[in-house]
A protein has these predicted regions:
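Adenine nucleotide-associated cytosolic modules
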Residues: 1-162
Length: 162
C-alpha cells in the first residue's frame, strides 16, 4: 500500500499488509488483518484492555472505536491528522472538542454529534495548519504523534496528570 511511504518501518514493503510486515520485524506482534468497523468491534472485548489507542486512518472506524470505548468505559486516546505538517513542536494533547485547524478532528466531531455522543476523550493533534495538498507525511511529525500517544498513555497508567 502506498500509504506505507510515510512510515519509518515498513516503507519498503508497498503492496504488503502493514500488520504482517510489523509481525515479521517484531516477533511479539500478533497480526490482525481485518477492517475495523462496527461489526468487527461488536465481537471484540474492549473491557479487557487498560487503554485503547486509535491510530486508524478511516473516519468511520475511528467513530465506531470511540463509541465502543465509551460504552465499555475503557480509557481511549485518538490520533488526529499528522499529514502535511512539518513541525513536531506544534503537537499537543487536547479534548476532541477543543482542537483547532485540524480537518480530521473537525470531521470526527461532526460524526460524533450525528451519533449523539456527549462524552469526551483526548486526542493528539497539531496546532500547525496543514500545508499544500500535494505534500505527504513527514515521518518526523507522524512518528512524534506516536511518541506523544505512548507518553500520554504511560503517564495515565501510572497515575500522573497527562
Amino acid at each position: 500500500e502506498i500509504t506505507n511511504q510515510n512510515r519509518q518501518f515498513g516503507s519498503e514493503h508497498v503492496g504488503e499488509l502493514k500488520c504482517e510486515v510489523f509481525a515479521r520485524k517484531f516477533k511479539g506482534i500478533t497480526p490482525i488483518a481485518a477492517r475495523i468497523d462496527e461489526e468487527f468491534l461488536s465481537g471484540f472485548d474492549l473491557a479487557k484492555f487498560d487503554f485503547v489507542i486509535d491510530a486508524i486512518d478511516d473516519v468511520g472506524a475511528k467513530i465506531a472505536l470511540a463509541l465502543r470505548c465509551s460504552e465499555a468505559g475503557v480509557d481511549f486516546v485518538s490520533s488526529m491528522g499528522g499529514a502535511k505538517r512539518l513541525d513536531p513542536a506544534r503537537i499537543e494533547i487536547r479534548s476532541i472538542w477543543q482542537t483547532q485547524g485540524d480537518p480530521l478532528a473537525r470531521k470526527i466531531r461532526y460524526e460524533l454529534r450525528k451519533h449523539g455522543f456527549a462524552g469526551d476523550f483526548d486526542v493528539v493533534c497539531s496546532s500547525e495548519p496543514p500545508r499544500v495538498k500535494s505534500m505527504g507525511s513527514f515521518m518526523g511529525v507522524t512518528a512524534s504523534f506516536g511518541l506523544f500517544i505512548a507518553s500520554y498513555v504511560v503517564r495515565r497508567l501510572i497515575g500522573e496528570q497527562a
